[in-house]
Swiss-Prot record:
Record-linked HAMAP family: ClpS
Name of the protein in question: ATP-dependent Clp protease adapter protein ClpS
Function in brief: Involved in the modulation of the specificity of the ClpAP-mediated ATP-dependent protein degradation.
Family per record: Belongs to the ClpS family.
UniProt-listed InterPro entries: ClpS (IPR022935), ClpS_core (IPR003769), Ribosomal_bL12_C/ClpS-like (IPR014719)
Gene3D superfamilies, alphabetized: 3.30.1390.10
Biological-process GO terms, alphabetical: protein catabolic process; proteolysis
Length: 104
């Protein structure tokens, strides 16, 4: 014996559209100090931010002259990872180079 419902459900579920927004972006910024060699800064920019030597040198000079230089703009997780990698590498090499992230 089959159970048959008294009423058929004729309602239609409406699909709610989710508005997706792009992820927040963050600038990764190197800060100047009086002790980290310029060549080390160039190497860091080339290695961790995949910049060519000329671009890396320009970023290093901006850090040297203006006190800070943007190495790139990334999503939060990537920016955070790059900051950690740069600071860790600098400490292991005995340099006080600072790297921070700021909302773009």
């Amino acid at each position: 014996m089959a159970i048959i419902p008294d009423k058929q459900d004729s309602s239609v579920l409406e699909r709610k559209e989710q508005k997706l927004k792009p992820p927040s972006m963050y600038k990764v910024v190197l800060l100047n100090d009086d002790f980290t060699p310029m060549e080390f800064v160039v190497m860091v920019v080339q290695e961790y931010f995949k910049k060519d030597r000329e671009t890396a040198t320009q970023i290093m000079l901006k850090v040297h002259r203006e006190g800070r230089g943007v190495c790139g703009v990334y999503t939060r997780d990537i920016a955070s990872t790059k900051v950690e990698q740069v600071v860790t590498h600098a400490r292991q090499a005995g340099h006080p180079l600072q790297c921070v992230m700021e909302e773009a």
